[in-house]
């Protein structure tokens, strides 16, 4: 939408987030959520006309347990105002494909195995983030999200995902791929 030479952008966050809670009595549990955001914008083409563009963004957020709330439920760092303990990874199409290959039994682990690191690796000017998603024989999946700020220490969040939770995750990620391509 042109408005005096400026384009307007709209961002739609899906109302529902997929969440897994893995609290522990000793307070060392964790939780995860997957969020979808759809960014719609208009950009000028080489011919001078304005064209709509759409970007579907997926984020995996893992948060450590921070204790218990006043009502006795587990609390997690993502509910704190200045959360610095949660780890967030923006999932690209390749990342989604690797997780789906693991959930479908085609691979034991998402991303590369062996070498300097295993799993999915993202790096930018602020540091790096890794996601390890591995099938555990007869027990479900192990998840580890970690970030290392440039010049800082590694911060990690890890928990398990049951086979049932994995099936729901598979359906949601397949739906995300369809959303990306509008199929």
Regions found by a protein language model. Give the residues of each.
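Positively charged, low-complexity terminal tracts
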Residues: 1-183
